[in-house]
C-alpha cells in the first residue's frame, strides 16, 4: 500500500541533505539527484519541500522523472487535504472576464504578440521575448528587411499563385517553417503538439526543439501522412545521451532530418529572462525558500554555485557541448544517424562555404543568429545571404540555404527568397500565436503570413516560388553594410 504523507512533513525536507518535492501528487526524494540536475542545484532547492508541479510540468516532457530518478526515490503520495492553499489575488470583474479576442480580429503578427503578452505568465514572456545584451541583433533582424525594396512587374497573369516548395526534397505547402523554439507549453498546454496541429492544415514544416516541453512521440503523434518534421540537436557533453535521442527520433517516420545547432555553444546573456528567474514560483511553504548563503555545499561536499539562476534559457543549456569541430563532430554525427543533416546558426560566408564542402553529408544550412539570443551585434541572416552571393554563390548550388530571424511580414518572406533562401523560419511568432490563442493562434499566424506572402508575389508579378530572384528586389542599401574584406575561402579550404 502506497505511503500517504502529510504536506507539513514534506516541507521539513528542504535542504541539500534531505530534499523532497511533490510532483503530480506524489512525493519524491531527489537528494541524490540535485547535484546532477541539468538546470543546476538551486532550481530544485528553491522548490524543496513544496508542490513543484506547476513549475515542473510546462518545461519537462513525459518520461523525464522515470529517466532520471531511481524507483526508490518515489516515497509515496501526499494527502491533498494537507497542502497549503495558494493565496488568491484580488482581481476586478473586468480582468476576470477579459480573455483573448477572436483570432480573426488580429491582422498582423504584432497584434498577436500583444495579445499573447497579456495572456502568458511573466516567466513565459521573459523567456520568449528575451535576447542577448542590448537586443541589437534581435531588433536588427527585423529592421533589415525594411531596407530592402521590392521591384514589381506588370502585365503578368497572377490569377494562380502557388506557395508550395520543397525542403530537402519534401513537398511543403509554404516556404515558411517553424524554427526550433523551446518550452512551448509555457505559452499554452497544447505545446509543441499544438503547433504541429496548426502546421498540418498548411503543410508547413516544423523543426522540433531539442528542449521541447513535450516528447517527440507526442508531437508527431497526430501528424498527417505527408507532414514534415525535423529534429534539432544540441550535442551533449555526454555523447551517449545525444546518440540515444537520435536513435529514438529515427524511429519516427515523420522526422525527416537532424538540425545540428551551432550558434550557441554557451548561452547569451538574456536579461529579461534572468529577471524572471524567481517570478511565478508558487511557494506557499515559506521554509522552502532556502537562503543562498545557508546552502554552501551538498552532502558530498560539492559547492553550490553562487551565481544567479540565469533564467530558463541558461538552465536549458546545462550539459550542452562546447567542443564541436567540423571534422570530428560531422564524422561522429554521420556515423550515428542516417537522417539528412542541416547545420543551423551559420553567420558568415566562410562557414557557409565550408559547410558546402561537406556535401552531400550536409544537405542544408540555416543562416541564423539564434534570434539575437546568443551573440549580440552578430549579423542578421540577410547579411550572410548577401555575403554568400558576393563571395561564394556556388554554395546555393551545393546545399539548400534556409534563414530565420526577424520575419514578421509576407514581404519579409519574399525578400529572403529573392536573395536565395529556400525557406524562412519563424520561432517567436509561433510561440506568441500559441500564447494568444492556442492552436487557433498558431493557425492565424500562419494564415496571415501565407496571405501576405501570396499578395506580395501577386503584386510583384510572380506565380510560383521558383520564379523569385534578385531581380525583384533592390538591396543596395543593405549591401553597403555587409562585410567587405578578403573572401577568406583559401584559408577556409586549408583548414579542411
UniProtKB/Swiss-Prot annotation:
Residues that coordinate or bind heme b: 37, 60, 127
Purpose: Catalyzes the oxidation of (S)-lactate (L-lactate) to pyruvate with subsequent transfer of electrons to cytochrome c. Also displays oxidase activity in vitro, catalyzing the oxidation of a broad range of 2-hydroxyacids, such as glycolate, (S)-lactate, 2-hydroxyoctanoate, (S)-2-hydroxyglutarate and to a lesser extent mandelate, to the corresponding 2-oxoacids, with a reduction of O2 to H2O2. However, the physiological activity of this enzyme is most likely to function as an L-lactate dehydrogenase. May be involved in the utilization of (S)-lactate as a sole source of carbon for growth.
Domain FMN hydroxy acid dehydrogenase, chain residue ranges per copy: 101-478
EC numbers on record: 1.1.2.3
Entry GO CC: mitochondrial intermembrane space
Note on how the cofactor is bound: Binds 1 heme b (iron(II)-protoporphyrin IX) group non-covalently per subunit.
Catalytic activity, reaction form: (S)-lactate + 2 Fe(III)-[cytochrome c] = 2 Fe(II)-[cytochrome c] + pyruvate + 2 H(+); a (2S)-2-hydroxycarboxylate + O2 = a 2-oxocarboxylate + H2O2; glycolate + O2 = glyoxylate + H2O2; (S)-lactate + O2 = pyruvate + H2O2
Chain residues that bind pyruvate: 127, 234, 370, 373
Residue span of region Disordered: 77-103, 290-310
GO MF term (any one): heme binding
Entry-linked InterPro entries: Aldolase_TIM, Cyt_B5-like_heme/steroid-bd, Cyt_B5-like_heme/steroid_sf, Cyt_B5_heme-BS, FMN-dep_DH, FMN_HAD, L-MDH/L-LDH_FMN-bd
Annotated FMN binding sites: 179-182, 209, 232, 261, 344, 404-408, 427-428
Keyword vocabulary terms for this entry: Flavoprotein, FMN, Heme, Iron, Metal-binding, Mitochondrion, Oxidoreductase
Family: In the N-terminal section; belongs to the cytochrome b5 family.
Presence of keyword Flavoprotein: yes
Name this polypeptide is given: L-lactate dehydrogenase (cytochrome)
Domain Cytochrome b5 heme-binding: start-end pairs: 2-79
Subunit structure comment from the entry: Homotetramer.
Location of this chain's protein in the cell: Mitochondrion intermembrane space
Cofactor: FMN; heme b
Domain remarks: Consists of two discrete domains, an N-terminal cytochrome b domain and a C-terminal flavin-binding domain. The cytochrome b domain is required for efficient cytochrome c reduction.
